[in-house]
Swiss-Prot record:
Name of encoding gene: Whamm
Name used for this protein in its record: WASP homolog-associated protein with actin, membranes and microtubules
Region (Mediates actin nucleation): 624-793
Organism of this sequence: Mus musculus (Mouse)
A GO term for molecular function: microtubule binding
Mediates association with membranes: region residues: 1-253
Chain intervals with Polar residues compositional bias: 618-628
A cellular-component GO term for this protein: Golgi membrane
Region (Disordered): 556-661, 675-699, 772-793
Annotated spans, Mediates interaction with microtubules: 254-623
């Protein structure tokens, strides 16, 4: 009675199979130090072997390679007693711990390190602690002792003693894991035995011995089916329970939503909970389908091996001897075809489940705001799944045809056997004897009816086989069409990706050019700001420079008014001479600003008429001052006789004449506001002209216009710069007060680009859904036809 198995496993604890394996030697390194704050030893253990392997694998982290903890002196003694019990040779290796350490740790009386730790030294003074050198020597001895213990008792044992792991023991495992492991092991053992029996077919030299092997093989296959069913049913049970719980909870929530009067928040929470239960139920269904596929894979693998081995055995025997084993071969073919058909149906369910998931993802894309490339990717995945589904359906039709062909061969064999039967009758010498043979004749007629029934069954099987062939041809055509669409979608995806890369490269080049232009603009602005600051600093240091410029300019203008060309030239020379002393007085000690000085004269191509290029006044004064500093003063020159009038000069180009006119105007009629502003870096000659100013042909016209008071100059309003502390709204209001005309914006029914992209996305999703549904509908049309194996059960 004691040897019988218990009815329940309550109170039993499963142990691991590899509970006492051969220990692997690891190199351990122990570090011991005294922690004066806690009054305990700090112990650290490093597994150098595991660290070296982790470093070779280039894995991050240090989990499982190092351990650390604190031990009191009493705890060290207890660990030593445990290790010495395992290995008695370790007893004399433990160094003696001084009693002062026990007093420092407070473990001798069990008082802890709380309030008593403050009162105890006042009542009973403790002996002096050992010195640092003694503690360091003691720690080194403990490290050596732990190293010896790891060599004698094993590193795992020392780690478990020093650093006990919290939780359950590692020697036990859960009941569910134990049951699953046991069932899997039994299934593997049965499959191994079946494989060994298949290998023993060559030892059977006679048909009688081979039939015994076949009988043993059938028994092992039935045992394999039983173990596989038990194992996979155990795997299926949690997912079935989850499916039932999720379905019942979902139905309860839907019933509550339909019947109860709930608020909007409660309704939203219940809907979210219902969707979560729906997701869990779908996950459970998917897991059930995957486990079912694995079960049929096991049975199909076993039957395939049995059929192949039997077909090899058929080659060793003749037709007459093999006739006894022929029914078993036909039965194996039928079983293999049926199991393969079940496997294909399970795969079909898995593929349809995946296809439905992709369709739901496509439907959820508008709410998630995904892009068009995600739609294309999901559609391509749907095409791939549909192609796999077509392959599965073709395999199902092939197995159905195999079943029909096997049945058809069996029926034809029966018909042949019936037709080959020969009935012998005794001769009759009288009518009475002939009447006595009537039952035998009726039996013969019954055999003919059986032959007719077999013939009709053969015709039905042929008709079903023809329908299967037509369905297979239709599926192949649809598969080819689906493959063409798949290739087309792949080409479109590649083209769009190529276009995206090309556009991206172009956009990168544009961004690079814009970035370079922005850097160049920033550099120009920075240099301009530096130049303006230098000019402003120069004007602040030389305030008399501008008054001298005004005086010289006014004198030169007055001297130029009554004369002609020769007087203008003399006045210009006099202007240079009079400007030199003033500038030499004011700007002799000031550093010269950085400005480009143009040459005073340029020769035309004919070489006859000199063309003067006017230089800004500041540059003239600076150049004059430098000449006055370097040369001694000269006596005044005697008056020269008037030269003969030169030939009239050719007309100047418009740009040069306008530049000269603008220069004279700026020299003569410069206001105080314009003098205070710094000069720009790049001078634009046409910036100061009015739009209707054509530019005079010579200086006489300029002087005549000045005499008549018709100077084509207009007052330029200086823009008032806003205060740095003013906000944007105040600047806008100030601009409105100055008379800025605001344009009325007409809000038209323009197309929002975001809405346009959303509409494009929705349209693409709708078209993709239509294509997916069309492809799925093409494959689902074949499910309406009855399966030819229904009658086979």
């Amino acid at each position: 009675m004691d040897s019988e198995q218990p009815d329940s496993l309550d109170g039993w604890v499963p142990l691991r199979e590899d509970l006492f394996p051969e220990p692997e030697r690891h190199q351990l390194r122990f570090l011991v130090a005294w922690n004066a704050a806690k009054g305990q030893f700090a112990v650290t253990c490093h597994d150098r072997t595991a660290q070296r392997r982790r470093r070779e694998r280039r894995e991050a982290g240090d989990g499982g390679c190092s351990w650390a903890g604190v031990l009191s002196p009493a705890g060290f003694r207890g660990a030593h007693r445990q290790l010495a019990a395992l290995w008695p040779a370790l007893e004399p290796c433990f160094p003696p711990l001084p009693p002062e350490l026990d007093a420092a740790s407070g473990a001798g009386w069990g008082l802890g390190r709380g309030l008593w730790a403050l009162l105890w030294p006042l009542l009973w003074p403790a002996p002096a602690d050992p010195g640092d050198s003694a503690l360091q020597e003691l720690c080194r001895q403990l490290e050596h002792y732990l190293g010896l213990a790891a060599e004698g008792c094993g590193g795992a044992t020392v780690r478990d003693v020093l650093f006990p792991a919290p939780g359950d023991s590692a020697d036990c495992e859960g009941l569910s894991e134990f049951r699953e492991r046991t069932l899997r092991a039994r299934l593997g053992q049965t499959a191994t035995r079946l494989h060994q029996v298949l290998q023993d077919h060559g030892k059977a030299n006679t048909m009688v011995a081979l039939m015994k092997v076949y009988q043993e093989e059938d028994e092992l296959y039935q045992e394999l089916v039983t173990m596989a069913t038990t194992f996979f049913q155990y795997l299926l049970q949690p997912f079935r329970d989850m499916r039932e719980v999720a379905t019942s909870c979902k139905l309860g929530i839907l019933k509550s939503l339909d019947e109860d009067e709930l608020g909007p928040r409660r309704v939203a929470a219940l809907q979210k909970e219902a969707s979560e239960w729906t997701r869990q139920a779908e996950e459970a269904v998917g897991s059930i389908q995957d486990i079912t596929v694995n079960y049929f894979k096991e049975t199909v693998t076993a039957l395939t091996g049995m059929q192949k081995q039997m077909e090899q055995d058929q080659k060793r025997f003749g037709q007459a001897a093999w006739a006894t084993a022929m029914p078993r071969l036909e039965n194996l073919k039928l079983m293999l075809a049926r199991e393969t058909l079940q496997l294909m149906r399970a795969k079909e369910l898995c593929l349809k489940h995946r296809q439905a998931e992709i369709q739901r993802k496509v439907e959820d894309l508008p709410r998630q705001g995904k892009q068009l490339d995600v739609v294309d990717e999901l559609e391509i995945q749907c095409y791939e799944i549909q192609l796999e589904l077509y392959d599965v359906k073709l395999e199902m039709l092939r197995n159905e045809e195999t079943i029909l062909v096997t049945r058809l061969d069996s029926v034809k064999r029966l018909i042949t056997e019936k037709q080959a039967e020969v009935i012998y009758y005794d001769p009759c010498e009288s009518p009475e004897e002939l009447q006595s043979l009537a039952p035998d004749l009726e039996l013969h007629l019954g055999d003919n009816r059986e032959l007719r029934a077999l013939s009709q069954q053969c015709q039905r099987l042929e008709a079903q086989r023809g329908r299967i062939c037509s369905r297979r041809a239709l599926l192949r055509n649809r598969k080819d069409h689906c493959r063409e669409n798949h290739q087309l979608r792949l080409q479109q995806a590649k083209q769009s990706l190529r276009h995206l890369h090309q556009h991206h490269s172009i956009q990168m080049k544009r961004d690079k050019v814009k970035e370079e232009e922005q850097k160049k603009k920033e550099w120009i602005d920075h240099e301009r700001q530096k130049t303006l600051e230098r000019l402003r600093a120069y004007k602040e240091k030389c305030p008399a420079h501008r008054s001298a410029l005004k005086t010289t300019c006014s004198e030169s203008m007055v001297s130029n008014l009554p004369g002609g060309r020769s007087q203008k030239r003399l006045s210009t020379a006099h202007h240079h001479k009079t400007a030199h002393p003033a500038s030499s007085k004011t700007g002799s000690a000031v550093p010269l600003p950085e400005a480009s000085v143009r040459p005073p004269e340029h020769q035309d191509p004919c070489g006859s008429v000199p063309v003067q290029a006017f230089v800004p006044v500041s540059d003239q004064t600076l150049s004059g001052s430098s000449e006055d500093l370097s040369l001694p003063p000269q006596p005044p020159a005697p008056p020269l006789p008037p030269p003969p009038p030169p030939p009239p000069p050719p007309p100047l180009p418009p740009a040069l004449s306008s530049f000269q006119g603008t220069t004279h105007q700026n020299l003569g009629l410069r206001t105080l506001a314009t003098e205070d502003r710094p000069l720009p870096l790049a001078c634009d000659p046409s910036a100061g002209r009015p739009c209707d100013y054509q530019g005079p042909g010579s200086m006489d016209e300029v002087l005549a216009s000045l005499r008549q008071g018709k100077a084509s100059l207009r007052k330029v309003e200086t823009p008032t710069l806003p205060h740095p502390g003013t906000s944007v709204n105040e600047q806008v209001l100030a601009a409105i007060r100055q008379g800025v005309q605001l344009k009325k914006v007409h809000t038209g029914q323009g197309v929002d680009p975001g809405k346009k992209s959303t509409s494009d996305l929705e349209r693409s999703i709708r078209e993709a859904l239509e294509r997916i549904k069309k492809v799925s509908a093409d494959s689902e049309e074949d499910n309406d036809e009855p399966s030819p194996t229904e009658w086979d059960r």
